[in-house]
Each structure stands twice: as structure tokens, then as C-alpha cells.
């Protein structure tokens, strides 16, 4: 309530009245909730279920951030010429396909399927992230871009935190107090 009435709020809640700003921030937090735990789940599968060492797991897992780092700059430039929301939507569709590939993940899931999933997620997230941030930043007046940037960071941290919390609760419910060890 104090922030709403402040002349110079630390975090301007009023920005969320802007539908484009709100929807793009919701998309951001949902994307982090959906994708942040993938590394933990796949790494646990590799090391504790399949018995891979951490180096091999890391080499496979680098697929996602590597492809994201390659695609994101191009997607950012493209989003200056084409509707960024369309690019971001295509990116999230690709991420969703990648996540669906991991639904049946177990000890017998082909590494090719896991790599395809990570590749799709990296490409999709690369297509999503920069255009979505472009949408958020361009949806506010120039004087509010510092606040919009804070919102982007807040959604990222909140999404990652919620993602980890949800995974922890799921692990606790499904496994109880069992010690996780390589098989």
C-alpha cells in the first residue's frame, strides 16, 4: 500500500496495470518455473539413475545454455523488426515441445531424446528471452525502463525460486526422507 501511494516507489506496482507489461512478466515467470528445474532433474537422472560422472552430465547439459546463447542475440535483433510477442510465442512453443520430450524420462530414455529436448529448449528459450524482454521494456515509457528492468530481474529470481521450491516439495512427497545415492 505504501508503494502505491509513494511519489518515488522502490518498485512501481502501477506498471502492472499495463496489460502487455503484465502478460510478458507472467510469461517470464512461468518460463522460469518450467525450465529452471530441468537441469536438476536431468542431472539427477544422469548421475543417480544412470551413474554418469559429473563431467559427462555437464557436457550433455551444456546443450541448453549453449544453443540459447547462440540464438538469443539473433532473436533480439529480429524482435526489433518483427513483432517480439510472435517470436517469443514461437520460442515458448518450441520449449514446450522440448519439455514434453522429457516427460517419460527414466533410466531407459535415449540420450538422443534428452539431447533433442535440451536443444529444443535452448533454441526455444533463445527465441523467447530477448523478444520477451524487448516487449517488457518497450511497453513502458522511457522514464520507467529502470523499473521495468527490475521487474524482469524479479520475475527471473521469483520463477527460479518457485521452480526449485516446487521440485523440492515434489521430491519430498514422492521420496520422503530417503537419501539419494547413485544406483
What is the role of each PLM region?
Residues 1-5:
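C-terminal membrane-cytosol helix-exit motif in multi-pass small-molecule transporters
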Residues 8-178:
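12-transmembrane solute porter fold
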Residues 182-183:
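Short, membrane-exposed interhelical loops at transmembrane-helix boundaries
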Amino acid at each position: 500500500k505504501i508503494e502505491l501511494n509513494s511519489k518515488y516507489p522502490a518498485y512501481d506496482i502501477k506498471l502492472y496495470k499495463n496489460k502487455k507489461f503484465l502478460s510478458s512478466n507472467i510469461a517470464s515467470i512461468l518460463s522460469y518455473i518450467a525450465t529452471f528445474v530441468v537441469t536438476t532433474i536431468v542431472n539427477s537422472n544422469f548421475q543417480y539413475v544412470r551413474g554418469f560422472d559429473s563431467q559427462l552430465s555437464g557436457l550433455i547439459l551444456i546443450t541448453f545454455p549453449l544453443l540459447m546463447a547462440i540464438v538469443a542475440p539473433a532473436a533480439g535483433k529480429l524482435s526489433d523488426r518483427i513483432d517480439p510477442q510472435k517470436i517469443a510465442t514461437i520460442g515458448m512453443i518450441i520449449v514446450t515441445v522440448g519439455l514434453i520430450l522429457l516427460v517419460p524420462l527414466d533410466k531407459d530414455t535415449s540420450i538422443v531424446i534428452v539431447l533433442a529436448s535440451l536443444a529444443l529448449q535452448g533454441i526455444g528459450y533463445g527465441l523467447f528471452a530477448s523478444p520477451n524482454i524487448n516487449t517488457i521494456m518497450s511497453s513502458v515509457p522511457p522514464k520507467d525502463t529502470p523499473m521495468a528492468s527490475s521487474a524482469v530481474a524479479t520475475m527471473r529470481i521469483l520463477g527460479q525460486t518457485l521452480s526449485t521450491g516446487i521440485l523440492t516439495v515434489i521430491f519430498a512427497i514422492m521420496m520422503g526422507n530417503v537419501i539419494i545415492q547413485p544406483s
